[in-house]
């Protein structure tokens, strides 16, 4: 029902190495003495990933004969709203290392064809410059066939061509993007 693609870096690897020790763990392990050194790769980059949701299958489990689409449509809607909130404020915590993974560019909508239109289609043509012409090409294809409405949210300051993104793609804030998607989800389930 919900699929996340792998996150792919949009930039070449340019990283660093973090070295640390774990004295607390070493002190709790009787046969290990020392600081138990470790290292971790540090890579800062813009990443792209795709999330696809088949709204017709939310709450449906044929193996257990569950169909919330018929029994509790509100639960289906609430699940997708919570998913959107999770993506909007995404972060990760691993070994006391917290990373902000909130989207800085988001594009999508509800389409009448189940296809991840933007998967592997975002690229940076130069340093922090989003390839707007490639996105426009995809949008023209979607719009020419009346497949649905596409929304775009962007933190313009994070891209060197923020003004081009705003004027060419008619982007809005990330908050407005997610608000419009939530509204689309509400409308979708209200009509079913």
PLM feature spans:
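Basic polyanion-binding and macromolecular-assembly surfaces
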Residues: 1-192
């Amino acid at each position: 029902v919900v699929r996340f693609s792998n996150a792919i870096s949009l930039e070449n690897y340019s990283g660093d190495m973090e070295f640390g020790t774990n004295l607390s763990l070493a002190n709790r392990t009787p046969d290990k003495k020392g600081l138990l050194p470790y290292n971790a790769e540090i890579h800062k980059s813009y990443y792209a990933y795709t999330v696809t949701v088949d709204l017709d299958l939310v709450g449906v489990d044929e193996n257990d004969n569950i169909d919330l689409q018929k029994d509790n449509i509100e639960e289906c809607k609430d699940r997708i709203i919570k998913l959107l909130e999770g993506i909007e404020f995404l972060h990760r915590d691993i070994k006391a290392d917290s990373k902000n993974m909130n989207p800085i560019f988001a594009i999508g909508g509800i389409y009448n064809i189940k296809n991840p239109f933007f998967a592997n289609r975002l690229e940076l043509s130069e340093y922090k410059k989003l390839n707007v012409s490639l996105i426009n090409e995809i949008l023209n294809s979607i719009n020419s066939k009346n497949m649905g409405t596409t929304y775009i949210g962007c933190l313009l300051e994070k891209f060197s061509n923020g003004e081009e993104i705003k004027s060419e793609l008619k982007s809005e804030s990330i908050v407005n993007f997610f608000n419009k998607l939530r509204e689309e989800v509400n409308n979708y389930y209200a009509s079913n």
